[in-house]
A protein has these predicted regions:
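Generic structural signal for short, solvent-exposed loop/turn connectors between secondary structure elements
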Residues: 15-21, 116, 151-155, 173-176
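Intrinsically disordered, low-complexity repeat and linker tracts
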Residues: 165-194
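Intrinsic-disorder/low-complexity, polar/charged segments enriched in Ser/Thr/Lys/Arg/Asp/Glu/Gln
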Residues: 21, 32, 119-121, 163-165
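Generic marker of "main functional regions" within proteins
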Residues: 34-36, 45-47, 88-90, 166-168, ...
Length: 194
């Protein structure tokens, strides 16, 4: 979605030359955020052990046991839960979001970027003015629907027409610690969590 405007003056005299085209600068009223996890290796090790333990009739399995099947990260579901309000309607006349909802969520899948990193998902959000923020929690589920992890609420800083990438150990997260983000940013930023 884009928004733009420009002025043109029309005259009644057909002899006056009018411009063939008019340039309109377009701008997105949206900001994009994306989560990238950097603990894929640890997650695969943990899941291999869990799967081997489950296959052995819930006997304890050590990390040296051979898993019954290879772990395919694309088999896992990622669910993003918006905590609080999520803007979902935009007015072109006021150039601002005009409505928001609670209880919004969306699903994604893990997409491997490297041996240790995977994209968890992304979304576009209408931004009021120049800067804003949304708060999300991220849940990881196996193909049977079992929740494997859930993050604490994470505040995502947003800036209109920019892409914010948040990087951290999200696959192994438990809802116990917090993630903090510096909201003073300019342009596209890749935020790395230790």
């Amino acid at each position: 979605a884009f928004k733009g405007s420009n002025n043109i003056t029309l005259v009644a005299d057909i002899m006056e030359r009018l411009p063939d085209t008019i340039n309109v600068a377009m701008q997105r009223p949206l900001a994009k955020f994306e989560f990238v996890t950097n603990d894929v290796v640890e997650f695969i090790d943990k899941e291999s052990t869990r799967i081997a333990s489950k296959a052995n009739g819930n006997k304890s399995a050590s990390s040296d046991d051979t898993p019954t099947r290879a772990v395919n990260i694309e088999d896992y579901k990622v669910v993003f839960y918006y905590v609080g309000f999520m803007p979902h309607a935009y007015s072109m006349y006021t150039d601002k979001p005009v409505d928001s909802s609670t209880g919004v969520m969306f699903e994604s899948t893990l997409r491997k970027l490297s041996e240790s990193e995977a994209s968890m998902g992304f979304d576009y959000v209408f931004v009021n003015g120049k800067k804003s923020a949304v708060t999300v929690q991220i849940g990881i589920y196996d193909n049977e629907g079992t929740q494997l992890s859930l993050t604490e609420p994470i505040e995502v800083p947003l800036k209109r027409s920019h892409h914010t990438t948040l990087t951290g150990m999200f696959l192994m997260s438990e809802a116990s610690g917090g993630v903090t983000i510096n909201p003073d940013f300019d342009g596209d930023h890749n935020l790395i969590f230790p």
